């Protein structure tokens, strides 16, 4: 049996993702996203999906629409 759940990142991977989300950048550019994915041992697609979902969760917690764009878009 695999230690990694089929439906999401492991606790260690989430710790890496959360650190980068909270301390580094909520909107990583493609190069940074690639580096975070490599550090966490996830694909770029999985990492991008996680950041998108986490950003929506953060926006809801701040009372913002979950799908609003940044002011730089």
Curated annotation (Swiss-Prot):
GO terms for molecular function: DNA binding. GO terms for biological process: cell differentiation; regulation of transcription by RNA polymerase II. It comes from the Eukaryota. Pfam families: Homeodomain (PF00046). Keywords: Cytoplasm, Developmental protein, Homeobox, Nucleus, Repressor, Transcription, Transcription regulation. It is found in: Nucleus; Cytoplasm. PANTHER family: HOMEODOMAIN-ONLY PROTEIN. Atypical homeodomain protein which does not bind DNA and is required to modulate cardiac growth and development. Acts via its interaction with SRF, thereby modulating the expression of SRF-dependent cardiac-specific genes and cardiac development. Prevents SRF-dependent transcription either by inhibiting SRF binding to DNA or by recruiting histone deacetylase (HDAC) proteins that prevent transcription by SRF. Overexpression causes cardiac hypertrophy. Acts as a co-chaperone for HSPA1A and HSPA1B chaperone proteins and assists in chaperone-mediated protein refolding. This is Homeodomain-only protein. The gene is HOPX.
């Amino acid at each position: 049996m695999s230690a990694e759940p089929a439906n999401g990142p492991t606790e260690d991977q989430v710790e890496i993702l959360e650190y980068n989300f909270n301390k580094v950048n909520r909107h990583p550019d493609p190069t940074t996203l690639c580096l975070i994915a490599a550090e966490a041992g996830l694909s770029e697609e999985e990492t991008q999906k996680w950041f998108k979902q986490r950003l929506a969760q953060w926006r809801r917690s701040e009372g913002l629409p979950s799908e609003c764009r940044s002011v730089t878009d």
